């Protein structure tokens, strides 16, 4: 049985200081290898030395094997994860909240599992998030946390699920680009584990090298033999063992075909493992403050009594820091990660979410293998040689309480000539064969980008500029690379498109238009129906933001001749059609958009508004239910449900989930404005005002909205904006 509940907990806490009320831009700060800009988030620069008991609104989730505590007020982090069989915390449990100035916006705490997105360390790691609890049909329970972040206007969710009879924590990540332009992100789940001289990181056996941040340095692994972090490892040092790393050190694995990473306590014979699909989760990282005086000083900075830890980070759609991936307009990416406790196995050789195994030589003639299961499973286990000779074949039942531990005489056969297979009903569940004994080449460290004038081709100028944008480089300016390319070839399509999109992001729409017109003219010189529709779509954006809607509409529609832009292009058309009260056209266009991207959550909300305006309320309500089944934090759909039903309880649920956060109201109201739904937007901001959920921007947005919609109350809204406290907003 799985249960979840909300509970107030008291945790000794060192309070943080007040955020700086005026913006700190930090536009040239280098942070974790990329830009340290945090605007519009406020920055906190002080911590208290005094500890107080502080109450937090925790959410617990528990089954027969695992108990987890989540703190929505601190970024939705996993604060505690407890193994009920072994009676131990399999994730480092810091009994105090003791922040240090490590985070992107200031405060950061050690322990638990932190989720770093859209960059590292997460800007909102010490801020509240939205939450809800979902009970699933199979008896599992999911605790969802959600955030619409302020820097790039992306949306991220994490769902923490426990299933009956399963000894793992399942985490589903769902990332969504709410904007009309491409955005970049990374996702690093950051579990901490308690360490001592007996602790060993468990990386897959095919990893022979590790990189530093930005791939600026490289080391062999697990035995380091050169200089890494200015430490001389020439004697050959096993850096998978915590005790051997004396200085602060990061390392990130180079390429693995395995789905796991973790760590093992050789003294207590217990460990933690992360499992995820390596095709989308290649990131495997260890970080330590170091087993030395500096590291112990940081232990004291971050905890009172819980001692040293390391971080065993797991990256999805990323393999390094920084290493960003693109999210196209309105694109959603989702994935699943598993964190689980295990025991007795030692250094895992292969693992899935269901089964873990290890095999080692035992004396001269035998081997010993152990298999751990995360649920009760009846499986067939076969140990054989490469020549097909069977040494062991048995159907066995394995449970989380009792692992399989067998010693088998293999007549002295070498370990690397053996194969272990675990199957059920003819389906392979887990397979092991030793890695070939070969010396793999160590990859080269990354090189700094050349200056624009040093690059030979316009193609490389474009790719370098795009890389700088993608990785949010703090000091190199991508514009210089695009401009150098255009100095050499003024009508180059890619560089004109890149500069046009750059200026759209900067709000310089007329300047963007000039570059995009050049790109489109070149693109269509010989062919009015080009292979790539992105410059045409971007030109539509530049025109739309200049309120030249008919011209924009034509461009958006033309971009939809290319399949890649039908999602965003038809959605943009539907917004303009709604704005112009052409609802039949809008409905057709929004349906075409949704055919290309079923998880365009903004399109779903707009379609409900269109159906409501057309009087097709039953269809709208059904779409709302379908949409909320996909994303319970689709606040646009929730507000539409209230507008259709006029049921106050529906509004109350929405307000509770939005937790009094002005940014949530702004985002949804601005979605309405983008489609000319001025009355709906104004009504939503008026709800926020009535609840006292305001910043000066609430009133400025409202005044602008009322003016655009030809509605009354414009002067009063702007008067209220002027009187509102500008702290943490700085709207002027």
Task: Please give the residue ranges for each predicted region.
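A contiguous, surface-exposed recognition patch within enzymatic or periplasmic domains that forms
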Residues: 2-3, 7-23, 59, 69, ...
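Extended, loop-rich substrate-binding clefts of extracytoplasmic carbohydrate-active enzymes
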Residues: 24-54, 58-62, 109-168, 296-325, ...
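Long, contiguous interaction/recruitment modules in multidomain scaffold/adaptor proteins
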Residues: 347-456, 629, 633-653, 726-730
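Residue-level recognition of tetratricopeptide repeat
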Residues: 466-467, 501, 541, 575, ...
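TPR alpha-solenoid repeat register
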Residues: 495, 528-529, 535, 569, ...
């Amino acid at each position: 049985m799985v249960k979840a509940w909300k509970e107030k907990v008291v945790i000794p806490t060192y309070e943080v200081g007040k955020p700086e009320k005026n913006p700190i831009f930090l536009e040239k700060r280098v942070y974790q290898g990329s830009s340290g800009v945090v605007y519009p988030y406020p920055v906190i620069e002080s911590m208290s030395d005094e500890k107080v008991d502080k109450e937090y609104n925790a959410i617990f989730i528990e089954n027969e094997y695992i108990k987890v505590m989540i703190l929505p007020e601190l970024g939705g982090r996993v604060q505690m994860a407890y193994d009920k069989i072994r009676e131990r915390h399999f994730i480092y449990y810091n009994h105090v909240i003791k922040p240090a100035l490590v985070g992107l916006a200031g405060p950061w705490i050690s322990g638990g599992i932190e989720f770093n997105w859209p960059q590292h360390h997460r800007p909102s790691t010490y801020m509240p998030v939205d939450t809800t609890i979902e009970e699933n049909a199979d008896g599992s329970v999911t605790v969802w946390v959600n955030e619409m972040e302020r820097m790039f206007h992306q949306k991220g969710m994490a769902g923490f699920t426990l299933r009956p009879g399963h000894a793992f924590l399942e985490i589903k990540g769902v990332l969504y680009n709410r904007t009309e332009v491409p955005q970049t992100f990374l996702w690093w789940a950051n579990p901490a584990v308690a360490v001592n001289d007996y602790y060993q990181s468990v990386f897959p056996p095919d990893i022979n090298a590790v990189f530093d941040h930005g791939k600026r340095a490289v080391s062999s692994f697990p035995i380091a033999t050169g200089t890494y972090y200015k430490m001389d490892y020439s004697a050959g040092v096993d850096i998978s063992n915590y005790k051997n790393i004396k200085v602060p050190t990061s390392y990130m694995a180079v390429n693995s075909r395995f789905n796991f990473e973790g760590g093992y306590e050789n003294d207590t014979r217990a460990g933690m493992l992360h499992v995820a699909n390596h095709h989308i989760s290649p990131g495997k990282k260890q970080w330590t403050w170091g087993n030395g005086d500096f590291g112990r000083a940081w232990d004291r900075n971050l905890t009172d009594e819980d001692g040293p830890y390391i971080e065993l980070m797991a990256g999805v759609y990323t393999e390094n820091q920084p290493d960003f991936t693109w999210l196209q307009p309105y694109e959603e990416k989702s994935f699943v990660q598993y964190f689980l406790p295990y025991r007795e196995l030692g250094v895992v050789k292969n693992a899935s979410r269901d089964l873990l195994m290890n095999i080692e030589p035992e004396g001269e003639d035998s081997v010993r293998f152990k298999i751990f299961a995360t649920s009760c499973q009846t499986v067939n286990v076969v140990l054989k040689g490469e020549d097909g000779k069977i040494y062991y074949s048995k159907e066995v039942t394995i449970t989380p309480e009792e692992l399989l531990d067998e010693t088998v005489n293999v007549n002295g056969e070498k370990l690397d000539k053996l194969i272990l297979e675990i199957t059920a009903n003819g389906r392979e569940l887990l397979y092991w064969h030793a890695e070939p004994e070969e010396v793999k080449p160590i990859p080269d460290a990354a090189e700094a980008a050349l200056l624009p004038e040093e690059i030979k081709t316009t193609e490389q100028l474009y790719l370098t500029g795009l890389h700088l944008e993608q990785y949010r480089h703090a000091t190199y300016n991508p514009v210089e690379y695009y401009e150098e390319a255009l100095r050499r070839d003024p009508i180059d399509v890619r560089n004109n498109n890149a500069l046009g999109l750059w200026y759209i992001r900067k709000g310089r729409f007329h300047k963007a238009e000039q570059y995009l017109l050049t790109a489109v003219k070149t693109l269509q010189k010989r062919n009015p129906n080009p292979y790539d529709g992105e410059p045409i779509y971007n030109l539509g954006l530049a025109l739309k933001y200049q309120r030249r809607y008919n011209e924009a509409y034509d461009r958006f529609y033309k971009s939809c001749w290319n399949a890649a832009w039908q999602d965003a292009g038809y959605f943009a058309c539907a917004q303009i059609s709604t704005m112009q009260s052409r609802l039949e056209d809008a409905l057709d266009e929004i349906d075409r958009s949704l055919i290309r991207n079923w998880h365009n959550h903004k399109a779903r909300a707009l379609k409900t508004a269109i159906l409501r305006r057309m009087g097709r309320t039953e269809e709208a309500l059904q779409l709302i239910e379908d949409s909320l089944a996909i994303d319970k934090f689709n606040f646009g759909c929730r507000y539409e449900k209230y507008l259709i039903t006029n049921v106050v309880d529906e509004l109350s649920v929405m307000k509770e989930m939005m937790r009094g956060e002005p940014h949530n109201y702004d985002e949804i109201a601005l979605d309405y404005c983008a489609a000319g739904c001025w009355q709906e937007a104004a009504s939503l901001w008026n709800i926020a005002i009535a609840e006292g959920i305001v910043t000066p921007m609430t009133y400025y947005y409202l005044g602008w909205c009322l003016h655009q919609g030809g509605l009354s109350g414009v002067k009063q809204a702007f008067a209220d904006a002027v009187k509102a406290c500008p702290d943490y907003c700085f709207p002027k």
